[in-house]
């Protein structure tokens, strides 16, 4: 079934965020055709009384005026140039971006407003915007994170059915790094019993190093209502031998105990501390100045 794209205007572009390292989020699209079985957004879709089951990702809202709205919001006297996170609730470089170019337009607005931002994506299409990312990074802090939980072919195909292959994401990491963009990798989510073996984790870290990633972080799967039901249904189809284990782990909680989580993420931390390349030296950025008006 092909996705339906709904072209709709938005009233606001920036969303205030609490309890996170960033103050604002920006999502040029709503919905995502990647349809990852573990996607945490399904939980929020269920809370909003929207489909969180297999129908999720079949209808994508395209915020056609998002760049214009963003320009107005960034132009307010009250704007403090706080960090904006792009892609917290949808992938900004899913296939629709190739046609509508809303993410690229938003990056240009952020660059023009000297506003720092970070991007989280599974989409290699981001390399198309290297020119804008370079311009923006000369004015403010810019970070791009690729989500690459595993390089295991079967795990990727069954849990991230609509995404680009992990190795193509690594190639995008290399191209961004070669262009001087601060790029890292998020191993999220790591799936207990499927992608948490030490050799699997180290494989990702070593590949990240070879591609030029300068940072890495890892999170273990968590399952809230809406996500839990869909994930377990998909697990029963693709990994039936794992269902009993996951039901025991997650039946009464969304997050695993800290000790279990640490036992999975600690090898990543140790490997990344010895394998990853150092961060680039901070660039010297010019102060923002008033642009001349063209009448």
Listing of model-derived features with the role each one plays in the protein:
Residues 134-137, 173-178, 269-272:
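Surface-exposed amphipathic alpha-helices with a cationic face
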Residues 1-9, 15-16, 193-295:
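Auxiliary Fe-S-binding modules of radical SAM enzymes
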Residues 114-115, 181, 213:
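A structural motif
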Residues 151-155, 160-162, 175-197, 221-223:
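Conserved strand-turn element in the central/C-terminal portion of the radical SAM core barrel
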Residues 1-33, 37-145, 149-157, 166, ...:
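Conserved Radical SAM active-site core
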């Amino acid at each position: 079934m092909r996705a339906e794209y709904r072209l709709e205007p938005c009233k606001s572009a920036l969303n205030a965020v609490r309890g996170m390292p960033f103050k604002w989020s920006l999502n040029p699209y709503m919905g995502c055709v990647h349809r990852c079985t573990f996607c945490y957004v399904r939980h929020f879709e269920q809370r909003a009384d929207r489909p969180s089951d297999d129908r999720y990702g079949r209808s994508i809202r395209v915020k056609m005026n998002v760049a214009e709205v963003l320009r107005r919001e960034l132009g307010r006297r009250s704007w403090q140039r706080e960090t904006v996170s792009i892609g917290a609730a949808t992938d900004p470089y899913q296939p629709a971006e190739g046609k509508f170019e809303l993410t690229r337009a938003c990056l240009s607005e952020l660059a023009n407003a000297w506003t720092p931002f970070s991007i989280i994506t599974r989409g290699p299409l981001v390399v198309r915007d290297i020119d804008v990312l370079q311009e923006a990074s000369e004015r403010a802090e810019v970070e791009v994170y690729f989500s690459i939980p595993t390089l295991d072919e079967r795990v990727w195909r069954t849990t991230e059915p609509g995404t680009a292959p992990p190795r193509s994401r690594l190639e995008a990491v290399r191209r961004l790094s070669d262009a001087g963009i601060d790029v890292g990798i998020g191993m999220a989510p790591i799936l207990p019993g499927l992608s948490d073996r030490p050799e699997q984790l180290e494989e990702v870290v070593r590949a990240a190093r070879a591609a030029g990633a300068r940072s890495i972080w890892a999170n273990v799967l968590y399952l809230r209502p809406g996500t839990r039901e869909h994930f377990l249904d998909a697990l029963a189809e693709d990994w039936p031998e794992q269902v009993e284990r996951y039901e025991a782990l997650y039946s009464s909680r969304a997050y695993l105990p800290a000790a279990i989580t640490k036992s999975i993420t600690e090898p990543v931390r140790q490997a990344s501390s010895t394998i990853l390349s150092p961060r680039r030296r901070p660039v010297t950025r010019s102060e923002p100045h008033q642009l001349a008006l063209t009448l």
